[in-house]
Amino acid sequence: MSDRWYVGVDVGGTTIKMAFLTTAGEIVDKWEIPTNKQDGGALITTNIADALDKRLSGHHKSKSDLIGIGLGAPGFIEMDTGFIYHAVNIGWRDFPLKDKLEEETKLPVIVDNDANIAALGEMWKGAGDGAKNMLLITLGTGVGGGIVANGNILHGVNGMAGEIGHITVIPEGGAPCNCGKTGCLETVASATGIARIATEGVTEHKESQLALDYDKHGVLTAKDVFSAADASDAFALSVVDHIAYYLGFAIANLANALNPEKIVIGGGVSKAGDTLLKPIKQHFEAYALPRVADGAEFRIATLGNDAGVIGGGWLVKQQENSMEKGNETE
């Protein structure tokens, strides 16, 4: 095994997660720095480079001990060039992220979407367990995802593949989505969507635990819904089944097209575990082709906040392997 390390970087709206990884994907060290949004995020690459230098010195290592940087970022990305067209939460617009970071660090940089690198991380070292055909669905404030086919992330013609949260599941009369459409999966299966559905129904279920929670706190959360469902509250169980129906329906349609080996559910909402997973699987099996359903295994994501940095390491590994194969054919 090489003594040199991969660098994984996961850029978020409030923090940037960073890690050194062995070539086997084990985290040697991990840390966070604040996301500096001043001047439209112009100083982020400098902050990353400075943080790398500082951390390297603590390990008595130098840049020559690093193989490259794999970075996940939000927003619309030109995958080949690492150019960020627009990342609302960061402030980047028409930002040459790959070029700037390579200039600052003097290391090769590979850039991909943050949801995609989380999928790669789970595939490599997490719930995907090495599966070369896998779906990752992240349920948090929004609904995101990544599609791994034959060991590679599907990007599509302009980087938009994997926008699972914007599959239309309610064609008419659905709630408005942040994307501008209505009835997207995100409007029902995100933490905010789950809370909205529960809140809209409490007036008709005044004896439920959720109605008591709402009267007490004036607000409901997805966590409240799953806690009440775990306590066998009938209304909460009906809300969970409602959102699981749409998730199972959407995932089945994806699976019928992609035939995945693993379907991994991640994000904060996935902490509900089997309370959510069991009804999703029931509805999935109702809409998936039997052979597709037989080949797919549902799993809860295991890497948590480490998925992105581990996936960043995989990007470097993948590029390193392709370069070695290229040299062999010359």
Swiss-Prot record:
One of its GO terms (molecular function) is ATP binding. Pfam families: ROK. Its EC number is 2.7.1.2. Transmembrane segments: none annotated. One of its GO terms (biological process) is glycolytic process. It catalyses: D-glucose + ATP = D-glucose 6-phosphate + ADP + H(+). It is found in: Cytoplasm. Coiled coil: none annotated. One of its GO terms (cellular component) is cytoplasm. The keyword Glycoprotein does not apply. Keywords: ATP-binding, Cytoplasm, Glycolysis, Kinase, Nucleotide-binding, Transferase. The keyword ATP-binding applies. CDD domains: ASKHA_NBD_ROK_BsGLK-like. Belongs to the ROK (NagC/XylR) family. This is Glucokinase. The gene is glcK.
